[in-house]
From Swiss-Prot:
Disulfide cross-links: 60-65
Chemical reaction(s) catalysed: 2 glutathione + NADP(+) = glutathione disulfide + NADPH + H(+)
Keyword terms, alphabetized: Cytoplasm, Disulfide bond, FAD, Flavoprotein, Mitochondrion, NADP, Oxidoreductase, Redox-active center
Enzyme class: oxidoreductase
Active site per database record: 473
Positions that bind FAD: 32-33, 52, 59-60, 68, 138, 333, 341, 473
GO cellular component, one term: cytosol
Lineage of producing organism: Eukaryota, Fungi, Dikarya, Ascomycota, Saccharomycotina
Coiled coil: none
Cofactor(s) needed by this chain: FAD
One of the GO biological process terms: glutathione metabolic process
Subunit structure: Homodimer.
E.C. numbers: 1.8.1.7
Protein name in the entry: Glutathione reductase
Length: 484
């Protein structure tokens, strides 16, 4: 793109005025799915506009996957530094958890600067692909136009042949609990300026588990309040049990079968008192973090054009991402199918392939089956396909065979028992050919290991296919191709 064209594009963005501008494709939401779809559409020559309310990259870049993983790295490194003595390293240094120092404010500055750089990269990539973008809050008018209210309260109006709603989600707050607003959401976790000495995380899902693990690894007195007996209840039993037991062993205070009933604040100290329905109180708390779920981010005037929502207020779409209104589409967290960044990216690209690409893509759609997912807990956990329970429900107990292995990875061979974390693998197979319909792993590097095995399961691999692969020794992953 020439300098003149670049300048012209900047001028267009600055002077999109009161006149109504028309596009081939208008995308509401600058998260992973929206950005991917807009860039792919523009690559086919579609005149494309992307509207984002806050910062490019959406939840993943700004309040989710990316800053979370950076925090996880810090916490994981803190834990591993403590293992050095087992390998006779730094024997003259006190590398215990009690002696750990972590400069949270300085680390936050570096992390936030990294995220800001990513925001800029997103903007530059959009410009490179020829996508126009504006910042502001989008809403539909009754005649199907899209109005954007910008930060300066100016309003711009657009029309388009095709419109994608990819606005993502937002955290849920327990508004009925007295004092709930003394706590913050998982989004606001990244805004904490100082490390809390004592923290309570509420919620058994992967977000709560990851945040509690980060705090514990960095030396905070970490409490996790869950309604059931185990964390990660949407995962296979082996993951639920292993992560729960390991967290307890590593010092996370898990309050099982508990619900928060009231939150009080001592105005003189700023400390919180968390009351549970078990009669127990957690006092002298510095920070309370709610991770009890997320809901679709709407407020777009979808009712003005008749877009149908389900009982959870998620946009109803068919297998091709079509909403109930012609030429209006939706994907990502706002539809609630598989709420993962790579899924939104893949769905966004395939939608644009279908709408603007060559004939070979006219029936392309996203496959939501066998999507690998991981939890950056301590240790990591990963899963693809059916859990053992789901497989039995679907195929019958007599048609399901399960292979299990539990061991200590070689990394821990030099350590005392108290410092070891378990590795546990499970294959769920069905039918005479023993097709692998589920794989569940817990242990170091599970996220990296799962990616390759995810390809195998997506291709329909059988237990015999796994067995035919020569193991890489010595590794933990070799266990998956030697299970008996």
């Amino acid at each position: 793109m020439s300098i003149r064209n670049t300048i012209n594009r900047i001028i267009i963005r600055r002077n999109m005025s009161d006149s109504i501008r028309h596009y081939d494709y208008l995308v509401i939401g600058g998260g992973s799915g929206g950005v991917a779809s807009s860039r792919r559409a523009a690559s086919y020559g579609a005149k494309t506009l992307l509207i984002e309310a806050k910062a490019m990259g959406g939840t993943c870049v700004n309040k989710g996957c990316v800053p979370k993983k950076v925090m996880w790295y810090a916490s994981d490194l803190a834990t591993r530094i403590g293992h050095a003595h087992s390998y006779n390293l730094f024997e003259d240094l006190p590398l215990t958890k009690e002696n750990l120092t972590f400069n949270w404010p300085e680390f936050k500055k570096k992390r936030d600067a990294y995220i800001h750089r990513l925001n800029g990269i997103y903007e530059r990539n959009l410009t490179k692909e020829g996508v126009d973008y504006v910042y502001g809050w989008a809403s539909f008018t009754v005649d199907g136009k899209v109005q954007v209210k910008k930060a300066d309260n100016c309003t711009e109006t657009y029309t388009a042949d095709h419109i994608l709603v990819a606005t993502g989600g937002k955290p849920i707050y327990p508004a009925k609990i007295p004092g709930y607003d003394y706590g913050v959401s998982s989004d606001e976790f990244f805004e904490l300026e100082d490390q809390p000495k004592k923290v309570v995380v509420v919620g058994a899902g992967y977000i709560g588990v990851e945040i509690a693990g980060v705090f514990n690894g960095l030396g905070s007195d970490s409490h996790l309040v869950i309604r059931g007996e185990t964390v990660l209840r949407k995962f296979d039993d082996c993951i639920q049990e292993t992560v729960t037991d390991t967290y307890i062993k590593e010092g996370v205070n898990i309050h099982k079968s508990s619900n928060v009933t009231k939150v009080e604040k001592d105005e003189s100290t700023g400390k919180l008192n968390i009351q549970l329905d078990t009669g127990k109180n957690i006092d002298n708390v510095d920070s309370l973090i709610w991770t009890i779920g997320r809901r679709s981010l709407l407020g777009l005037g979808l009712e003005n054009i008749g877009v149908k929502l389900d009982a959870k207020e998620q946009i109803v779409v068919d297998e091709y991402q079509n909403s109930s209104v012609k030429n209006v589409y939706s994907l990502g967290d706002v539809v609630g199918k598989v709420e993962l960044t790579p899924v939104a990216i893949a769905a966004g690209r395939k939608l644009s392939n279908r709408l603007f690409g060559p004939e070979k893509f006219k029936n392309q759609k996203q496959d939501y089956e066998n999507v690998p997912s991981v939890v950056f807990s301590h240790p990591e956990a990963g899963s693809i396909g059916l859990s053992e329970r789901e497989a039995i429900e679907k195929f019958g107990k007599d048609n399901v065979k399960v292979y299990n292995s539990k061991f200590n990875a070689m990394y821990y061979a030099m350590m005392e028992e108290k410092d070891k974390t378990p590795t546990r693998y499970k294959l769920v197979c069905t039918g005479e050919e023993e097709k692998v319909v589920g794989l569940h792993i817990i242990g170091d590097s599970s996220a990296e290991i799962l990616q390759g095995f995810g390809v195998a399961i997506k291709m329909g691999a059988t237990k015999a296919d796994f067995d035919s692969c020569v193991a890489i020794h010595p590794t933990s992953a070799e266990e998956l191709v030697t299970l008996t």
